[in-house]
Every structure is written in C-alpha cells, then in structure tokens.
C-alpha cells in the first residue's frame, strides 16, 4: 500500500519531475519542480488547494519522481513525458491536423523525403507544411533541379548496383549506385536545397533562370517554358505571402483565442522576412487554466521536437517560465533565443494578424465539433428509440478474427457518448476453442468479460463498467450466443447484431430477432458503421501481431529441412502445431512442398 504521507518524507529537496498515477496506473499529471519535496507536498496540503487541483489529487493513488541536475533539464523531461503520455490533467498539445514535413535523411548521399513523423534520427526536418500537395510539388521541383537520389540503397553499408536506374540516364542523378561520385559536390547541392526549404529561394531561382536561358539559347523553347513556369510557381508552392519584414528576419509569431473550454493556438513562421507557412493547434482547457499557463505549456511541447528554432519568437501573451524556456531554446539552438512581447510598431500588427487567424481557426473547429456532437447525439437518440434504453452512455462491440482457425482472437471496443474510448478497448486470446468456431469464440470472450465484471475478488478493475448496450459483429447466431452468456450471469443488457451486405458493408441491425434496415448517411448509420469498422480493425491488428509472433517462434524452426515456406504450408494444412506433432510421415508428405526426408525429420524430432 502506498502511504502518501510517508512517501513525501522520502522525496528529496532537489530539482526534478514528479508523476502522478491513478488507481489504474494511468499517468494523470506530470510536473516539474526546483524543489521536489516542497512542490509535491503542496498538492497534498488541504489548506492551499484550488478546486481544480483538489479534483486531480482526489484521483492520485501514488506518485513517483525523477531527479535531474537543474530546472532546465526538468523542463525538457516534463515536456517529453507530457507529449508521450498525454496526462488527463495537463495541458496537452493537439494538432488539428497532422501536417507533413520534408525530411533530409542522415546517411551517405542523403535523400529528400515527405514524412508525417518527426523522429530523433539526426535527420533534418522542414515544416510542417499546411498543404500536403505543396510538399509533393516542392520535392518534385527539387528532384527536377538538383541531382538528389531517390533510391533506397544503403550506401553506409556499401550497397551498389550493376546498372544505374532511369534517373541517371535522364540526368537527374549522378549514379552513385554504380559510379564513384564526389560526396562534397553532392552535399553542396544539398545545402542549396536546405536554404530553399528555409525560405531562401534565391539560389534555386537563379539556377532555374540559368537553365531557362540556356534552353532558350539552344532553341529548346518547350523546356524553357517549363522552367519559366517553375520559377513563377516557387512562391505559390511554398505558399508565400506579400507580408515582409524589411530586416529579413527569421522569427515565429504565436497568439491564441479561447472560448469556453477550447483554445486555439496559432503559429506563423517567418523566414528571411517572409511568412512562409502557419499551423494551428487545438487545446482542451476544461480546467480553465490561464492564458499565461496555456501558452507557456505550448512553448514547452511545441519546440521540444523542432529541429529549427529561430532567434526570435514573438507573442502577445506574457508566458509562464519565460526565462527558463528561453534558456532551454538557447541551449537547443546553440545561440541566443529571445521571446519578445512587442508593444508597438509593425510587429504588433503582425501579431494581431496571427490572433485574428487563431480566432478564425477556433470558430471553424467549434463549428465542426458542434456538428459532430449533434450527429452523435442524434445517433444515440435513434438507438434509444430502438432499444428503449436511456441513457446510452457506453456501447461495447465484439468481433473475432483468425486465419483458417489459427491464432483466434477476440476484441472488445468501447464507444462512450457516441465517441470511441480507446483506453477501454480490450483484447482476448482465444484459449478454449480449436479452429474457426465463431460462436464458441464469442461465447468464451463474453464469458471472460462478464465474469471479470462480477468477480468480487478481482485485482483488475478495467472491466468494472457495465455497458448500456452490446453490439455483436454478426447476425442472429452471434446475438443468441451473447444472450445465452448474459442469462448465465443474470444480466439484462440489450444486444444488437450488426449485419453486412454482399459487399461487406453495414446493412442493418438485428434486434429482438428482427432486422432493421439502415438508411445510408444518417447519423445512426455512420455511428454503427464506424463502430463496426473500428472493431474489425482492432481485432485484425491484434490477430496479425499474434500470428506473426507465433509464426516466427515455432518448434518447427529447430527441424532440419523445414524452412519458412514449408512451415507456412504445414500450418496452413494442419492448422495447429499439435496436429503436426501427431501426423504420420505419409500425412506430412501430403502437404505442398514436403518430401519424405523432411517428413521423417519432423516425426523423429517430436518422438524425442
């Protein structure tokens, strides 16, 4: 048992990060402190607690802490832990869209790629870009202008080819896959690409202009026209605007808008005095944090993974931990970074433009959010009318997945108030059923689920909530199995079956032995379709992982002459390893690809 008062006495007076857990071992809050004992102790001092702090502390089952050298290290660690765990009571940065980046890989003869994931792999990332099509255009333009390779060869390991690919013959690559290419010359071209991606397009424009003039001189007017269009389109591709800063500065501009429990933080990126892109983030603010706290938390999480930090960041809000954040960013950049709050002049006008865009982004998000909420409410109301259950807070849906009866698994997915609740999803490895028996597998899954619900001695609390209704991915057979299981536990929960048409699309629901057809594009149809697809996806993913794991780790791997192909054929034919063990030489020889010697090896191996 974790005694909070006793554990507080063990916390050192040192800088670090503290982590609060609830009874389900979920991380619900992460914070930093110059003095861990004093800061953590404040949470449990009843005389000094605010209402929102009291709400969080009431759910704390235990805490842990990590000691670091200084407050700056604590800030970085806190930001990383918040980003990784998304604790319930922290301000969590959530991008309204997952924008793409352009990546220059960290390898011999680096490549230029499009990606949506920023990894800590020492590569260089540029973006994010609001327009995914623009990213494709930018990469195409780079490959048309510079001889940057597109192949996946690993030159660090010395991979080579006998003949170069098509790009070599159309003069888009120097063929380092076959010939010796000067790395220094290659990297010079790559540096021009980096400058272009940082908003300094002069070198690229000059290179294209020179090519255009040469093409025109050689009477190749078609190529010259194409190059002219590329020059014209550079501004459009990078989504540049006519707003400029005469000093040609690199800076970011950050503002926000808030309404009720929702906040939109807007960032504009200025490079070489020109605004090249923007990005906005939606933040849930159900605990009514101050603007200073929200934007301070935004700074910590937003800049922790960015590869490029400008010398200057403008904002119109006085942020928490400003000096500490400046110190963190300065250390990250390797040179001085300033966070400024301008009071007059051109920069205040620019920030006002950012604020207006934040308000616009917030209004659009709320409009979309309200529409989704209305659709969910209407779908739930329709379900209530069909089942007579009010309210419908929790929907559970079940599905079974296997490959020819091998590695059968069950899935339980949960929707709360019409929205998926992935933390409540559960996976079941089928233990008592051999082969592809959908009914028996469903019976096992449902029995295990509701036995845990009613088990008074259970250690696992994850099955404590009772569903309002149950959905079965199937027809009357699956529904009847579910009814039998619930009757065994004396439970009365409405059960609906989700039936599909010949094209495997949701057709309707089975309720009280009758099929109710659904009209496509109604809120109820969209909700049930989403639930059915999510259940199937979750089951399939778990089955594949389990199947791959079991396939890779098999006793058959220890037998001579049994490789991957034969192992796969044996499992497909016999379904289980136990059946293979019991098979005779003659039965084993019936399998595709097997011969007598390989069959004898299997029989002799399992006789040992």
UniProtKB/Swiss-Prot annotation:
InterPro entries with a match to the protein in the record: DisA/LigA_HHH (IPR041663), GIY-YIG_endonuc (IPR000305), GIY-YIG_endonuc_sf (IPR035901), GIY-YIG_UvrC_Cho (IPR047296), Hlx-hairpin-Hlx_DNA-bd_motif (IPR003583), RuvA_2-like (IPR010994), UVR_dom (IPR001943), UVR_dom_sf (IPR036876)
UniProt-listed Gene3D superfamilies: 5' to 3' exonuclease, C-terminal subdomain, GIY-YIG endonuclease, UVR domain, UvrC, RNAse H endonuclease domain
Residue ranges annotated for the UVR domain, each copy included: 202-237
Pfam families for the chain: GIY-YIG, HHH_2, UVR, UvrC_RNaseH, UvrC_RNaseH_dom
Keywords, ordered alphabetically: Cytoplasm, DNA damage, DNA excision, DNA repair, Excision nuclease, SOS response
GO biological process: nucleotide-excision repair; SOS response
Protein location: Cytoplasm
Recorded GO MF terms: DNA binding; excinuclease ABC activity
Any single GO CC term annotated in Swiss-Prot or TrEMBL for this entry: cytoplasm
Family stated for the protein in its record: Belongs to the UvrC family.
Function: The UvrABC repair system catalyzes the recognition and processing of DNA lesions. UvrC both incises the 5' and 3' sides of the lesion. The N-terminal half is responsible for the 3' incision and the C-terminal half is responsible for the 5' incision.
Quaternary state and interactors: Interacts with UvrB in an incision complex.
Protein name: UvrABC system protein C
Organism, scientific name: Finegoldia magna (strain ATCC 29328 / DSM 20472 / WAL 2508) (Peptostreptococcus magnus)
């Amino acid at each position: 048992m974790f005694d909070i008062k006793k554990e507080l006495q063990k916390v050192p007076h040192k800088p670090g990060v503290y982590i609060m857990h609830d009874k389900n071992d979920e991380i619900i809050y992460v914070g930093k402190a110059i003095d861990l004992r004093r800061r953590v102790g404040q949470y449990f001092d009843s005389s000094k607690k605010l209402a929102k702090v009291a709400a969080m502390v009431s759910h704390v089952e235990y805490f842990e802490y990590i000691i670091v050298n200084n407050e700056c290290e604590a800030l970085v660690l806190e930001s990383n832990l918040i980003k990784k765990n998304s604790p319930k009571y922290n301000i969590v940065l959530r991008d309204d869209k997952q924008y793409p980046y352009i990546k220059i890989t960290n390898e011999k003869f680096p490549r230029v790629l499009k990606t949506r994931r920023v990894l800590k792999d020492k590569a260089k990332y540029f973006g994010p870009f609001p327009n995914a099509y623009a990213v494709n255009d930018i990469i195409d333009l780079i490959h048309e202008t510079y001889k940057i390779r597109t192949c996946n060869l690993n030159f660090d390991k010395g991979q080579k080819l006998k003949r170069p690919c098509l790009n070599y013959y159309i003069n888009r690559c120097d063929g380092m896959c076959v010939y010796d290419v000067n790395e220094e010359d290659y990297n010079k071209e790559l540096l021009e690409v980096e400058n272009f991606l940082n908003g300094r397009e002069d070198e690229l424009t000059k290179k294209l202009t020179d090519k255009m003039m040469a093409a025109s001189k050689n009477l190749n007017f078609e190529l010259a026209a194409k190059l002219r269009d590329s020059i014209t389109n550079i501004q459009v591709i990078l989504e540049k605007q006519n707003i400029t800063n005469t000093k040609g500065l690199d800076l970011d501009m950050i503002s926000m808008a808030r309404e009720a429990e929702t906040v939109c933080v807007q960032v504009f990126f200025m490079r070489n005095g020109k605004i090249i892109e923007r990005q906005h983030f939606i933040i849930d603010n159900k605990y009514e944090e101050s603007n200073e706290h929200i934007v301070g938390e935004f700074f910590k999480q937003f800049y922790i993974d960015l590869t490029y930090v400008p010398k200057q960041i403008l904002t119109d809000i006085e942020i928490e931990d400003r000096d500490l954040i400046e110190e963190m960013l300065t250390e990250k950049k390797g040179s001085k970074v300033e966070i400024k709050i301008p009071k007059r002049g051109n920069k205040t006008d620019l920030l006002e433009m950012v604020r207006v865009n934040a308000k616009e982004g917030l209004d659009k998000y709320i409009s979309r959010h309200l529409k989704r909420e209305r659709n969910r409410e209407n779908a739930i109301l329709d379900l209530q009318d069909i089942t007579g259950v009010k309210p419908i807070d929790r929907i559970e849906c079940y599905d079974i997945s296997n490959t020819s009866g091998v590695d059968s698994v069950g899935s339980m997915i949960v929707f709360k108030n019409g929205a998926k609740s992935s933390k409540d999803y559960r996976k079941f490895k089928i233990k008592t059923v051999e082969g592809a028996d959908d009914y028996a597998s469903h019976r096992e899954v449902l029995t295990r689920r509701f036995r845990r619900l009613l088990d008074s001695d259970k250690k696992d609390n994850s099955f404590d909530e009772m569903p309002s209704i149950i959905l079965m991915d199937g027809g009357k057979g699956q529904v009847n199995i579910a009814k039998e299981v619930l009757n065994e536990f004396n439970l009365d929960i409405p059960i609906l079956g989700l039936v599909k048409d010949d094209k495997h699309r949701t057709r309707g629901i089975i309720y009280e032995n009758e099929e109710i057809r659904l009209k496509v594009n109604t809120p109820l149809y969209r909700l049930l379709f989403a639930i059915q697809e999510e259940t199937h996806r979750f089951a399939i993913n778990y089955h594949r992982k389990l199947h791959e794991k079991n396939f890779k780790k098999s006793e058959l791997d220890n037998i001579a002459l049994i490789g991957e192909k034969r192992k796969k054929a044996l499992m497909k034919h016999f379904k289980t390893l136990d059946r293979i063990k019991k098979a005779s030489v003659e039965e084993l020889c019936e399998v595709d690809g097997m011969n007598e010697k390989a069959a004898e090896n299997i029989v002799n191996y399992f006789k040992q």
